[in-house]
């Protein structure tokens, strides 16, 4: 009798601003480049598990990356500009990444933007406004996640005198910071 094992790795890819129409347009374009009609399928729509999520914000018909990221990370809606908090702007919402970490999984966040930008921040931070970069950076340091990769912090300077910058805080929390080709 073999016990069923869970997956070894789970990857959660987010195409920021990408919906079904953008995927279809890309597939149509790729076919046209080859001189044919129809579509040339992308790989990811044929993954074994694919989900469509409505990320409309609680405050607007058109969402922003903060509310959309919060919906993707937590399954809950919030207002535009909110990072990981309910519409009351105070109550934190637990993300799927935190659930995974609490269950014993190693968790990493990789992004093409800064690590304290709206979409990646929704997986570890709880702030009332997406531009609270220093506070979001503090949340990153306290996250206990295993890995972050991105294009730096947007506001690494300390918020108050006597406080260390985010690089020092991250190193003190056990993170190794690599710049360039390190």
Specify the residue positions occupied by each region the protein language model found:
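N-terminal catalytic scaffold of extracellular/periplasmic and nuclease hydrolases
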Residues: 2-182
């Amino acid at each position: 009798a073999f016990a069923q094992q869970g997956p070894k790795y789970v990857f959660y890819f987010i195409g920021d601003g990408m919906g079904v129409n953008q995927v279809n347009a890309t597939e149509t374009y790729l076919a046209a480049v080859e001189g044919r009609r129809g579509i040339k399928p992308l790989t990811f729509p044929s993954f074994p598990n694919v989900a469509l999520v409505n990320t409309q914000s609680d405050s607007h018909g058109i969402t922003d990356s903060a509310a959309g990221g919060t919906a993707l990370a937590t399954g809950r809606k919030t207002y535009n500009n909110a990072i990981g908090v309910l519409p009351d702007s105070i109550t934190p919402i637990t993300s799927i990444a935190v659930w995974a970490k609490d269950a014993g999984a190693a968790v990493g966040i990789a992004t093409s933007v800064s690590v304290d930008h709206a979409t990646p921040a929704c997986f570890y931070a709880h702030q009332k406004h997406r531009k609270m970069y220093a506070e979001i950076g503090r949340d990153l340091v306290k996250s206990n996640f295993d890995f972050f990769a991105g294009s730096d912090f947007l506001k690494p300077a300390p918020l108050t005198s006597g406080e260390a910058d985010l690089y020092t805080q991250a190193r003190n929390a056990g993170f190794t910071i690599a710049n360039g080709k390190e």
